[in-house]
Amino acid sequence: MKVTIRINGDVLSAYIPKKDLEEPIISVANEDLWGGSILLRNGWRLALPHLPQEARLPVTVEARRMFGRLDRGAHEKPDRMTRIGEISSSQDAAAMLAENQKMHPWPALTRTAYEDVAACISSGELSGSGLGIINAFERRMEEWIGGGYVVSASSGTAALTVALIALGIQPGDVVLLPSYTWAATALAPLLIGAIPRFVDIDPNSYNISPTALAAAITPDVKAIIVVHMHGISCDMDEIICHAREQGIAVIEDCAQAHGALYKGQHVGLLSDIGCFSMQKSKHLSAGDGGFMVTRDPTLAQKMRDICNFGLPTPKANYRFDEVVRDGYAVFRECEQIGGMFRLQPMSAALVMHQLEHLRQRIAWLQTAMEPLVEESAKIPFFKITRSHVDRTHVWHKIRVGIDYAAVDYFGRSMAEIRRGLRNSLAERGISSTLWTAPILPLQTAFRPYAGVVEWTKSAGHLAIENSFIVFDENYPLIAQEPAKMAELVVKLQQAWDEHFTSLARGK
């Protein structure tokens, strides 16, 4: 039957192949609905794409049939999804931008994923510790990483927090971390009363600088968190050497580095604890979720207990009620500080099948990036982080840098040069973002911990001020259409040539 939708005054009419669906007229004026969905009669759901507030772009509305009663956990099957139409755009450039932002649905789910989640719901195992699906996920993840003990968590932020607690970090202890990273890296120590101290980065890799790290180590430093930014490993040998000399624990934040290797070893296995995120924008996505990995079985058990309120989780040949104190069985007693940091079982089910194809997707992405890296090296004032012979880059994001020599050459500010290049890319359908800017010590929440460093003159600040991220920050690069990746190098060259000519003309 025909469906008519009014979207901010525009009318979209299309057909849903279900004869018993009455013809509804829906008005959508609230921008908060973009990216959400509307549930119709007979179980159809209309999924509305996310739109920028400042632009009227082509809209593709998807209809999905929900199977089962809505009040009993109805689920949808991807093979019954129907694309039902578009509304017109007022600008060709905006239309191209919207078209080029189309990506594979992410996470990339198969029918098996839907069936696994439905089976999880049917099993009734929706919460708790030591559940079968959680154990299966952890064992599968250990195999995929190639060693260690995996402990699941509710998020990457939770994983970092649990790791710090497990390593004995106390209120007032100092934790070193890079100035350029996502806020969660600094929030984790603050959540347990520790003090983050920021360390400058290497402007070529955007990872923490080992030299700056060595200079920042003082007697009150108890832990170091390194972040493998955008999918390439830090210089771990040098970092571990500095830490071990001082007896300092090291945590790897691997939120953007699923599949990344350093000298043949998977990141996360190179330190005391590796922490991973499974938020939607990651290579491995559960919507939200995370996990830790360590080579130390005692540390793994401690983290498992911390994730379960600090309660001892079941061990082999052990029963809670076997412990007797003052004539009473001790069934539940917190043995340490913890919280409810457990991974949701349905999230584990959602992720399990993704591992089967993740290496293949990463390999495709690495192949797609080779010509981009090579050709970008020929563009004046351009730079894209290259991989190293001793590590594997998994390209979570592409950060395009502009050499500061361009400022002197053109006599323009870096902000003007960067803005013009981004506009030129947008005209060719390539979106971009600044992602997290400014660097953390210049953000309001973290200024009290910035110390005496002039961060506006730091390598990290300058590196972020003269660069930007290509494509949508809410999706990993791996979610891009292959055709769009193939076109990217050409469009980057075209955008820069046009912008270069414009800047040169204005000299």
Swiss-Prot record:
Key words, A-Z: DNA-binding, Pyridoxal phosphate, Transcription, Transcription regulation, Two-component regulatory system
GO biological-process terms attached to the record: nitrogen fixation; phosphorelay signal transduction system; polysaccharide biosynthetic process
Annotated consequence of substituting residue 74 to P: In strain: RM220-3
Modified residues (N6-(pyridoxal phosphate)lysine): 282
InterPro entries assigned to the protein according to its UniProt record, in alphabetical order: DegT/StrS_aminotransferase (IPR000653), NifT (IPR009727), NifT/FixU_barrel-like_dom_sf (IPR024044), PyrdxlP-dep_Trfase (IPR015424), PyrdxlP-dep_Trfase_major (IPR015421), PyrdxlP-dep_Trfase_small (IPR015422)
Gene3D superfamilies: Aspartate Aminotransferase, domain 1 (3.90.1150.10), NifT/FixU-like (2.40.50.240), Type I PLP-dependent aspartate aminotransferase-like (Major domain) (3.40.640.10)
DNA-binding region: 256-275
Resulting phenotype, residue 67 to S: In strain: RM220-3
GO function terms (MF aspect): DNA binding; pyridoxal phosphate binding; transaminase activity
Similarity-based family: Belongs to the DegT/DnrJ/EryC1 family.
Functional note: Involved in the biosynthesis of the rhizopine 3-O-methyl-scyllo-inosamine. May have a regulatory role in controlling the housekeeping genes within the nodule which are involved in the biosynthesis of the rhizopine backbone.
Protein name listed in UniProt: Protein MosB
Source organism (scientific name): Rhizobium meliloti
